[in-house]
């Protein structure tokens, strides 16, 4: 998957298009991500026991990973990610849009 937990991402499609948030959870089986304060849904819960009251719960629903793009806050640009090796041979992630700006 092209995104990791903790990445800052920009939403590309849907009702939250253009918003920026941080990934809090990744669901690998369905290639979905949960982004903080994005795609917030409400669930109405009926009371289960005697004397308990009903509730309206708010939660962040998952979004498909193809609908988000990694966002660079420093240059304020969303870009795809390229992988390169540094001098020690460790893989690092580099923004493709920032590679051609030398």
UniProtKB/Swiss-Prot annotation:
GO cellular component annotations of the record: chloroplast; ribonucleoprotein complex; ribosome
Pfam family, any one: KOW
Superkingdom in the source lineage: Eukaryota
Disulfide bridge map: none
Biological processes, Gene Ontology terms: translation
CDD domains for the chain: KOW_RPL26
Subcellular compartments: Plastid, Chloroplast
Signal peptide: none
Membrane-spanning residues: none
UniProt GO MF annotations: rRNA binding; structural constituent of ribosome
Gene3D superfamilies noted in UniProt: 2.30.30.30
Key words of the record: Chloroplast, Plastid, Ribonucleoprotein, Ribosomal protein, RNA-binding, rRNA-binding
HAMAP family documented for this protein: Ribosomal_uL24_B
Function statement: One of two assembly initiator proteins, it binds directly to the 5'-end of the 23S rRNA, where it nucleates assembly of the 50S subunit.
Subunit composition and interactions: Part of the 50S ribosomal subunit.
Family membership: Belongs to the universal ribosomal protein uL24 family.
Protein name per its UniProtKB record: Large ribosomal subunit protein uL24c
Source organism: Rhodomonas salina (Cryptomonas salina)
